[in-house]
Design a protein with these regions (language model features):
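N-terminal beta1-alpha1 cap of cysteine-dependent amidohydrolase-like domains
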Residues: 1-113, 127, 134, 138-151, ...
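Catalytic cores of DNA base-excision repair glycosylases
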Residues: 164-174
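Short, surface-exposed beta-strand/loop micro-motifs that present aromatic residues
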Residues: 199-204
Length: 244
């Protein structure tokens, strides 16, 4: 019997283990806005923490879902992309979450399960597919209180990109909060959007239904309906050809 609302898997980094309650609260609020927006566009969203779930259970959850969102959070472990473990800008990592999410990304691409990556989610997708990261950069996060860390800036999207089509613009004004970014794109990926300083801001895959953005369309101060547009694209792609 068909389900009335396609199930959406929202994968967070972790549900616990953080030293900063304010940062945890920010991440929870962002993910809850993904869940709420998903409901508005006709998706039934469930949040799952990757670190506590593990690869096997996360893949089982993916198999029961029609689309997936990877949310923001901590750094990707530099060991996964040849980064410097002693880098002065190295942040907190959750290696167990990385392992589970890498397995999920590979399976989602293989099965052509629609995937949306937000902030760290975009970085994780890139690393999972063999790319690497700029390990530390400045100017894309406001230091101090995580509740006030967002930075507003322009993005230039390739006019022929699917991301521009989905968002209905080639020049969105977005909200970012990150100190890492995509450097070399992974296999099958291409950068389709950049910030004024050249930082990669959007990724697409050559064949899989995948939309990754470095910014936070789920932030309460975000302009427009970018998050809803991305989730609608994922929803609509669940009905497309080529699904395994």
């Amino acid at each position: 019997m068909a389900r009335d609302r396609p199930p959406l898997l929202v994968v967070d980094v972790a549900a616990s283990g953080r030293d900063d309650p304010a940062f945890q609260a920010v991440l929870d609020a962002l993910s809850e806005r993904v869940v709420a927006t998903a409901a508005l566009v006709g998706l039934d969203a469930v949040r799952v923490p990757a670190a506590e779930t593990g690869p096997e259970a996360l893949l089982a959850a993916l198999a029961d879902s029609d689309a997936v969102v990877l949310t923001g959070g901590e750094d990707v472990d530099p060991a996964r992309y040849g980064g410097d473990d002693a880098h002065e800008g190295r942040g907190r990592t959750f290696p167990d979450a990385d392992a589970a999410q890498v397995a999920l990304v590979l399976e989602a691409v293989r099965t052509r399960t629609p995937l949306v990556g937000l902030c760290r989610g975009m970085q994780l997708v890139n690393v999972a597919l063999g790319g690497d990261l700029v390990q530390h950069l400045t100017g894309h996060v406001r230091p101090g209180d995580p509740r006030r860390s967002m930075v507003d800036h322009d993005v230039a999207l390739d006019p022929d990109s699917d991301t521009a089509r989905v968002l209905g613009t080639t020049d969105p004004v977005v909200r970012s909060s990150h100190h890492q970014a995509v450097a070399r794109p992974g296999t099958g990926l291409r950068v389709v959007g950049r910030a004024p300083d050249g930082t990669a801001e959007a990724l697409e895959h050559e064949s899989a239904p995948l939309w990754c953005v470095q910014w936070h369309p789920e932030d309460e101060g975000a302009r427009g309906d970018g998050l809803a547009a991305l989730l609608r694209a994922a929803r609509d792609a669940t009905r497309g050809p080529g699904r395994a």
